[in-house]
């Protein structure tokens, strides 16, 4: 069965009232009103005004939050019903009522008929969501009007338009029903009288030919007023809350003429609740409070007036939200639901003198009406007209079976004690949620309405929240003044509880508020902060993005979620263009190579932006910052230490205050440099260094006799042998002093002991030994011929020199017991050599590896080789490595055997010679390299991004390094540069390509030699032929 949602409003057309104003006496109920107890009724629902033209008193509206008033009109309802005393006479008069066909002509005496119909018309704006209504009207008014094709009767039996057809059998009326009909007729007559007095109101936008009313064939219950129908007015302020109608709550109808907007809150109607109708043409803005109707609650009426002199606590300035009622129709089969525009929200409110009559009508018809109520306000996506500022809630009327069940409960008083939870699961959920909502509103107000709390309430309901709510067709009422067509928005009614978080609750375009919901605090979800993503990275949806959307909207993945525009600024086209730019920049960066020129050797920087910056030039700021650093200062002792008195020496040199150890080191250094005499003259007598020099000289036997003859004159010594002594004086010839005092001879013999220590193999003819001659400072005249040959041709003969030195060291130092192979390596750029030790099958072995790039002279090879052989001996013979005690023992043994060797040290201090120098043209930074492997045009400085030039380092005749600009590659380098790309393949390594290039270069170089040889041979043959001819 299809579910339809209607929005009820006053369908009485005041323009069609053709009766002249009549002076009828004011009718009111003679019975005394009685107050309802406060326990079952939260608020007093209504009371009639003492006079229809008097000021309206403040009353609480006992209406459903989701229902508007049924419009009631009848031509014959203005009869005086209150004075009828005889109930039987009235019953007989009412029983004679006949159903008039629609096409029948209007008779002189109109017959009264009650019609419950559902009429709709197309909206003015042409929207699909149009307003609907349930109308109770007089068929005598519309007898001359044709039926629109889109009309639908709510009754299960269709109206017979044939005048010759038999009339509908008249139902038997009981006394109770007669009383109820009497009350109905009285209220209708009062309302008609007031409309006649006040004149016609603003006509509706629909023509009379398009309006219709149809009879609803229903088993109408008795409509007799009781003492509870009229209640005294109340002036208590009405608050917005939830209204719960219990199982036996009777119909509450509010009829009003000038109330413009009725503010009603959410209401949960039970399955057993009877139909609640609300009829109004222009409702005053009022608030309806929470009301719990008990099982035996009588019909409540409300009579209100539009006069401004009444004492009211109603907030007239508050915007009133709209409501909609969901009515599943079961009467007519095959008929479409007609649509009718609502004029209740747009009728003119300028008629301030119009009075309002509110009466209570108990209508019990067999209308199957279901209730589908989301727990909170459902999202009104159909509110494409922006006049509404908040979402509307949907409610429905009870079904006809429920009305019959209510009649049965009224007859059986024991059924009132039936539990509320005895109905189906949907009813249990609604009752549970209503009570929970009521309690939470009392405790927390509106602050508890969050998605988590709503979801928890649903899960805690009787059915566990498993039943899906009905999805009615939301029909929207459009004002008369609405002429602009709005684009319909997607249906968001399925959002249910989350609608208040996804819809803007207020707009400033119109003060009208047709949702009939209380003004609430606007809840907005802020946009998620957008994080900046890399432009080259494509956007990927989150793995739980779809699930998050479904939590909010089960049908649409884009309307309800605020995640849809989280990355609105991210554009694929922009990312593509940016990625293209990045690729171009990468290609440009790939062509350039950045070099770090702050080190001695050039270092290639792959990415200068990401790598740590190289150390820059020294700046004055560094010194200032260094001076500002916190430093730990030595604390002064509490009691100063007493120091011995030291005699101050004025005008004494800085030297002379060394201790014994320092004196020994100074003297040993001077002894190696043959500077003992200079050292003795620099230090004063009595100093530790001077004393140490004297001790060394005494041990070496240097200057022992020279100390006794410093005062003798060398001239006398030279003249004594020349003078011939007389013949008689022979003994003086044998005098010892001339022989003893020979200071020049003694001074000439001083360097002899040092030569014997420094040069163990004394060179013949005054030349230096082999090891000493390998040094570049030794001249060619004093150098050994073989050593000089190796020194001058070291690059070509370094292997032979290494083998020669190895044999010499092994024989003198290691007794020919050391067997160590010697290799050369191009990978060692800073290390002069290394000894690689191995152990295999409990046998130790070593391999000495020498650097080609560091060992560029013969003297470096001499010192490095003995250093590494000492490591090998310590490992092979003693099983120890490193520069420990064993290594130092072997180094001292080598120094003792070869005095010409310098002191064997742990580390070298060789300045590495590079073949090329790279220099920046911008910042003048320079660094060195052993080879050139990149084009100079593609090189840039890492510090200043400036261009780099290349220099070639060469030595002149004096041995000084001269840097000259490097020219173009020549020979094999140029051949490789020109042909490397031609021979390169994907499956070949660079070494394989170089082998091919070497073969090709050798072939190319050998062709001219063969050509020259062939030409020479041809010439020789030609000469021989000439000789033979001669």
Curated annotation (Swiss-Prot):
GO MF annotation terms: DNA topoisomerase binding; MCM complex binding
SMART domains, alphabetized: SprT
Extent of Low complexity compositional bias: 720-748
Alphabetized UniProt keyword annotations: Chromosome, Cytoplasm
Compartment(s) where it occurs, according to its Swiss-Prot or TrEMBL record: Cytoplasm; Chromosome
Source superkingdom: Eukaryota
Renumbered residue ranges of the record's region Disordered: 1-59, 196-245, 266-361, 375-433, 457-594, 699-764
InterPro entries: SprT-like_domain, SprT_Zn_ribbon
Pfam families: SprT-like, Zn_ribbon_SprT
Keyword Cytoplasm applies: yes
One annotated GO biological process: protein-DNA covalent cross-linking repair
Biased composition (Polar residues): 298-316, 329-349, 505-516
Annotated GO CC locations: chromosome; cytoplasm; nucleus
Record field: compositional bias (Basic and acidic residues): 20-33, 541-553, 578-594
Transmembrane segments: none
Deleted gene: phenotype: Homozygous mutant females initially laid eggs but stopped after approximately one week. Many of the embryos derived from these eggs exhibited maternal-effect lethality. The few adults from F1 progeny of homozygous mutant females appear sickly and sub-fertile. Of these, 4% display bilateral gynandromorphism a rare phenotype caused by X chromosome loss during the early embryogenesis. By contrast, embryos from homozygous mutant females displayed X chromosome bridges and second chromosome missegregation and polyploidy.
Stated family: Belongs to the serine-aspartate repeat-containing protein (SDr) family.
Its biological purpose: May play a role in DNA-protein cross-links (DPCs) clearance, ensuring the genomic stability by protecting germ cells and early embryos from various sources of damage. Limits replication stress and DNA double-strand breaks.
Protein name: Germ cell nuclear acidic protein
């Amino acid at each position: 069965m299809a579910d339809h949602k209607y929005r009820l409003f006053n369908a009485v057309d005041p323009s069609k009232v053709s009766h002249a104003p009549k002076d009828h006496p004011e009718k009111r109920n003679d019975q005394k009103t009685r107050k309802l107890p406060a326990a079952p009724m939260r608020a007093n629902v209504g009371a009639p005004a003492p006079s229809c033209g008097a000021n309206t008193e403040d009353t609480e509206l006992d209406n459903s939050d989701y229902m508007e008033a049924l419009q009631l009109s009848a031509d014959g309802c203005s009869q005086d019903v209150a004075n009828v005393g005889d109930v039987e006479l009235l019953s007989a008069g009412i029983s004679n009522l006949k159903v008039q066909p629609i096409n029948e002509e209007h008779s002189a005496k109109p017959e009264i008929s009650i019609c419950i119909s559902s009429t709709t018309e197309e909206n003015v704006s042409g929207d699909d969501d149009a307003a609907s209504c349930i109308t109770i009207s007089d068929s005598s008014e519309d007898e001359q009007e044709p039926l629109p094709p889109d009309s639908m009767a709510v009754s299960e039996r269709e109206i017979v338009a044939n005048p010759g057809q038999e009339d509908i059998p008249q139902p038997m009326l009981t006394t109770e029903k007669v009383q109820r009909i009497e009350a109905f007729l009285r209220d209708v007559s009062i309302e008609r009288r007031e409309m006649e007095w006040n004149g016609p109101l603003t006509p509706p936008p629909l023509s009379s030919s398009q309006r219709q009313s149809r009879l609803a064939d229903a088993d109408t219950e008795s409509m007799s007023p009781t003492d509870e129908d009229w209640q005294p007015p109340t002036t208590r302020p009405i608050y917005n809350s939830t209204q719960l109608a219990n199982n036996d709550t009777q119909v509450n109808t509010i009829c009003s003429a000038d109330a413009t907007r009725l503010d009603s809150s959410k209401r949960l109607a039970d399955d057993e609740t009877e139909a609640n109708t609300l009829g109004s043409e222009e409702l005053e803005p009022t608030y309806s409070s929470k009301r719990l109707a008990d099982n035996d609650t009588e019909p409540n009426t409300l009579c209100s007036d539009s006069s401004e002199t009444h004492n009211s606590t109603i907030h007239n300035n508050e915007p009133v939200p709209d409501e909609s009622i969901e009515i599943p129709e079961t009467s007519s089969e095959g008929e479409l639901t007609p649509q009718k525009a609502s004029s209740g929200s747009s009728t003119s409110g300028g008629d301030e003198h119009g009075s309002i009559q509110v009466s209570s009508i108990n209508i019990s018809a067999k209308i199957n009406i279901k209730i589908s109520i989301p727990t909170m306000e459902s999202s009104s996506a159909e509110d494409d007209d922006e006049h509404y500022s908040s979402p509307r809630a949907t409610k429905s009327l009870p079904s006809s079976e429920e009305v019959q069940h209510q009649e049965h409960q009224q007859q059986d008083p024991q059924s009132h004690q039936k539990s509320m939870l005895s109905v189906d699961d949907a009813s249990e959920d609604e009752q549970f949620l209503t009570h929970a909502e009521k309690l939470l509103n009392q405790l927390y107000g509106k602050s508890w309405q969050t998605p988590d709390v709503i979801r928890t309430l649903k899960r805690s309901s009787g059915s566990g929240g498993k039943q899906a709510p009905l999805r009615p067709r939301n029909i929207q009422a459009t004002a008369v003044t609405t002429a602009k067509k709005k684009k319909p928005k997607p249906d968001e009614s399925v959002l249910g509880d989350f609608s208040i978080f996804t819809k803007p609750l207020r707009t400033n375009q119109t003060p009208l508020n047709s949702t009939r919901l209380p003004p609430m605090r606007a809840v907005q979800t802020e946009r998620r902060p957008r994080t900046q993503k890399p432009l080259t990275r494509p956007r990927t949806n989150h793995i739980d993005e779809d699930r998050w959307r479904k939590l909010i909207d089960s049908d649409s993945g884009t309307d309800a979620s605020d995640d849809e525009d989280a990355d609105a600024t991210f554009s694929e086209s922009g990312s593509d263009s940016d990625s293209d730019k990045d690729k171009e920049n990468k290609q440009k960066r790939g062509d350039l190579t950045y070099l770090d020129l702050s080190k001695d050797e050039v270092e290639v920087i792959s990415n200068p932006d990401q790598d740590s910056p190289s150390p820059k030039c020294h700046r004055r700021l560094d010194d200032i910052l260094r001076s500002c650093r916190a430093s730990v200062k030595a604390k002064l002792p509490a009691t100063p230490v007493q120091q011995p008195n030291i005699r101050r020496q004025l005008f004494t040199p800085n030297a002379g205050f060394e201790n014994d150890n320092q004196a020994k080191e100074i003297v040993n250094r001077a002894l190696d440099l043959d500077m003992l005499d200079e050292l003795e003259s620099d230090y004063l007598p009595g100093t530790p260094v001077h004393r140490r020099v004297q001790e060394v000289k005494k041990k070496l036997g240097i200057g022992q006799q020279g100390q006794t003859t410093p005062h003798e004159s060398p001239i006398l010594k030279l003249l004594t042998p020349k003078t011939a002594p007389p013949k008689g004086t022979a003994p003086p010839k044998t005098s010892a002093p001339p022989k003893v005092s020979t200071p020049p001879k003694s001074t000439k013999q001083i360097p002899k002991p040092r030569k014997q220590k420094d040069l163990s193999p004394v060179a013949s003819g005054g030349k230096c030994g082999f090891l000493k001659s390998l040094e570049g400072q030794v001249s060619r005249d004093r150098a050994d011929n073989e050593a000089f040959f190796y020194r001058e041709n070291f690059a070509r003969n370094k292997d032979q020199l290494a083998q020669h030195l190895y044999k010499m060291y092994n024989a003198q130092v290691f007794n020919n017991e050391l067997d160590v192979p010697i290799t050369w390596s191009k990978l060692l750029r800073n290390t002069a050599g290394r000894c690689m030790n191995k152990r295999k099958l409990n046998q130790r072995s070593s391999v000495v590896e020498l650097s080609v790039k560091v060992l560029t002279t013969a003297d470096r090879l001499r010192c490095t080789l003995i250093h590494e052989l000492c490591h090998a001996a310590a490992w092979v013979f003693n099983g120890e490595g490193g520069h420990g005690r064993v290594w130092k023992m072997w180094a001292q043994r080598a120094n003792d055997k070869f005095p010409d060797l310098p002191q064997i040290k742990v580390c070298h201090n060789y300045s590495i010679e590079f073949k090329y120098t790279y220099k920046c043209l911008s910042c003048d930074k320079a660094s060195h390299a052993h080879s050139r492997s990149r084009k100079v045009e593609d090189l840039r400085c890492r510090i200043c991004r400036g261009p780099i030039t290349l220099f070639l380092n060469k030595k002149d005749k004096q041995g000084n390094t001269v840097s000259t600009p490097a020219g173009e590659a020549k020979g094999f380098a140029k051949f490789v540069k020109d042909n490397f790309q031609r021979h390169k393949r994907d499956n070949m390594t660079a070494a394989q390509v170089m082998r091919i290039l070497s073969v090709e270069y050798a072939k190319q170089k050998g062709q001219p030699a063969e050509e020259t040889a062939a030409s020479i041979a041809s010439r020789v043959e030609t000469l021989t032929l000439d000789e033979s001819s001669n």
